[in-house]
Design a protein with these regions (language model features):
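Conserved N-terminal entry element of GNAT/NAT acetyltransferase domains
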Residues: 1-19, 168-169
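C-terminal "cap" of GNAT-fold acetyltransferases
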Residues: 2, 120-123, 127-169
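Conserved GNAT-fold acetyl-CoA-binding loop/helix
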Residues: 4, 8-11, 22-51
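A short helix-loop-beta-strand connector motif used in the catalytic cores of GNAT acetyltransferases and
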Residues: 49-63
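Conserved beta-strand in the GNAT
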Residues: 64, 70-78, 86, 91
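Glycine-rich acyl-CoA binding loop
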Residues: 73, 87-89, 98-106
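A conserved beta-turn-beta hairpin within the catalytic core of GNAT-like acetyltransferases
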Residues: 79-90, 97, 116-118
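Conserved acyl-CoA
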Residues: 104-121
Length: 169
């Protein structure tokens, strides 16, 4: 990996961001079906530019990672409650996983959550098959917790997810 750049995505980046989010959801839904033996239907596999508004300022943040100028990963913050933000759609292209792109994005999200969004708590959910992601989250001080209010995971499927939280200093 030659050059990693992280930056806030703007409207000019929508095609790259939507492409990465669609790749993530396609992979996640296929892996879910392969792992658990049934399909999870989701309209979220079809992201739109308008849907990205929930991840943009003033109540969110959308980060695009680029390696050598090409889209490499995406991650988002979304406000939940006063002082609480949620990490969503964190994804690194498979061929770049293991090269610290995800850890760099997570570190930036945590910094921006505290400094720019005034968050005291960061939450996230992650399917149980995403064990590499769990190690990353735990290495940054996230602890497992019960499902939280506002999670988009249906109640009947929550046992297949891990829910995390970290208090910011």
């Amino acid at each position: 990996m030659d050059q990693l750049q992280l930056r806030e995505a703007d409207a000019a980046d929508d095609a790259a961001v939507l492409g990465l989010m669609t790749q993530y959801m396609t992979w996640a839904l296929a892996t879910f079906e392969r792992t658990y033996g049934f399909a999870m239907t989701s309209t979220e596999a079809r992201h739109t530019g308008a849907a990205l508004a929930a991840f943009r300022r003033p109540s969110g943040l959308l980060v695009l990672a680029e390696v050598d100028g090409a889209p490499a990963g995406v991650a988002a913050l979304r406000a939940q409650d006063d002082g609480v933000v949620e990490i969503k759609r964190m994804f690194v292209r498979p061929e770049l996983q293991g090269r610290h792109v995800g850890s760099a994005m997570l570190d930036l999200l945590l910094e921006q959550a505290r400094e720019d969004l005034g968050a005291r708590v960061v939450r996230l959910d992650s399917n149980r098959f995403m064990t590499d992601a769990h190690r990353l989250y735990e290495s940054r001080g996230f602890v497992e917790r019960d499902p939280y209010p506002g999670s988009e995971i249906p109640a009947e499927l929550q046992h297949l997810w891990r829910f995390y939280e970290r208090t910011l200093d």
